[in-house]
Amino acid sequence: MDHLKHLQQLQNIERIVLSGIVLANHKIEEVHSVLEPSDFYYPPNGLFFEIALKLHEEDCPIDENFIRQKMPKDKQIKEEDLVAIFAASPIDNIEAYVEEIKNASIKRKLFGLANTIREQALESAQKSSDILGAVEREVYALLNGSTIEGFRNIKEVLESAMDLITENQRKGSLEVTGIPTGFVQLDNYTSGFNKGSLVIIGARPSMGKTSLMMNMVLSALNDDRGVAVFSLEMSAEQLALRALSDLTSINMHDLESGRLDDDQWENLAKCFDHLSQKKLFFYDKSYVRIEQIRLQLRKLKSQHKELGIAFIDYLQLMSGSKATKERHEQIAEISRELKTLARELEIPIIALVQLNRSLENRDDKRPILSDIKDSGGIEQDADIVLFLYRGYIYQMRAEDNKIDKLKKEGKIEEAQELYLKVNEERRIHKQNGSIEEAEIIVAKNRNGATGTVYTRFNAPFTRYEDMPIDSHLEEGQETKVDYDIVTT
């Protein structure tokens, strides 16, 4: 009985909204920004709204005479329904009534979707992943159509912009506007990672992309912020070990082997307790489609409103929605979807990418934008593109290549002498925990300058560190070989 009463009330609400349109024709635009004819529960009311929309398109008055003339012959509205609409008492403020109609429409669609899910779930021929993908798209469509919001006028936008300026002034000129990257000089370029941004971090293998990402993850955890990490290459446990190595300054080799003294165990326990309290979430499936990323992030955001940033390692390991597409089309789709998702959830998304092997053939092996694999879409969608470059990696490879060349030329003694010299240097530098220089190249910055940030890389702890301004090596000077630990 209560349900029947609710439906009768809804029918009356629909009539009041339609009567309001007849009284003030201009209101149809406001109503149509939220409602479609299919949103009306009572079919004659939906047909009335459809006719009113056609009259508005033709610049005709929306009144009783024109409504009756415009009614299609095969879809007649009963006289009592027309009389009920024209006799309804209109109100000036119909926004609340429009919202009520929309809410009821969404609930009906959800009920229908639930039945569809049940039917599809009982069909053994369909894959569960396909059903989930279809459901996610339907729910997202409902979410997108459930709000009364549309265009925003300039006054509202300017007020919002002024609020941002005032807030930044309150924080102070040295504060970043987004989430700190963990590197002061990089923040000076980017103002941190800002809401809605897609940030790309690219490098060749062995440059330490994952290490840099984990440094940024630990920095982002401050201020009780939630952080999501999609690791498609390494397990969550491996990333957790890197985080512990960074925080405890216990090198990875000792940490993995468990050869720790009492002080190190105590330090490890403290860091374990500290990190356990953080809102850090890992998703480490090795195969993932863009739909799964979207679904998991939306779910996490709904459960943890404090989610502030997401990291993906790395983009080319993801698949597009359709495997039949060319790979560059899939990558373009993925980058576009990530950018859209960043804006929707109002968080920055940081995606790591692998760079083309062709850059290895250049004398200057510092990456440029065209080095991104299948790069067209990525370069276009990204707000910021960062490249990682460590000169010592290439110096080591050059030395190894020189040793191989000497062997091939039959200069065995010379090759052996160089081999012993190089290995001794690497052993000493590894033992002493020497630090090498690394460059973070800001290759694209939609809202700021481009340039190079010089950092230190501490390989035993897989940690990047800020470097004082102007303390980097002179241009053209070779980076000193430090150790033979190579990270991914």
UniProtKB/Swiss-Prot annotation:
Region Linker, residue ranges = 145-175
The major lineage groups are: Bacteria, Pseudomonadati, Campylobacterota, Epsilonproteobacteria, Campylobacterales
What's the protein name? Replicative DNA helicase DnaB
Record the organism. Helicobacter pylori (strain ATCC 700392 / 26695)
Which segments carry the region annotation ATPase domain?
Answer: 176-488
**Segments of this protein annotated with the region HPI:** 390-433
Report the sequence similarity comment from the record.
Belongs to the helicase family. DnaB subfamily.
Provide the reaction this enzyme catalyses: Couples ATP hydrolysis with the unwinding of duplex DNA at the replication fork by translocating in the 5'-3' direction. This creates two antiparallel DNA single strands (ssDNA). The leading ssDNA polymer is the template for DNA polymerase III holoenzyme which synthesizes a continuous strand; ATP + H2O = ADP + phosphate + H(+)
What exactly does this protein do? The main replicative DNA helicase, it participates in initiation and elongation during chromosome replication. Travels ahead of the DNA replisome, separating dsDNA into templates for DNA synthesis. An ATP-dependent 5'-3' DNA helicase that prefers 5'-tailed substrates (have a 5' single-stranded (ss)DNA tail). ATP, GTP and UTP are equally active for helicase activity in vitro, while dATP and CTP are less active. Its DNA-dependent ATPase activity is stimulated by ssDNA. Binds ss- but not double-stranded (ds)DNA. Rescues a temperature-sensitive E.coli dnaB mutation in vivo.
In the UniProt record, the gene name given for this protein reads dnaB
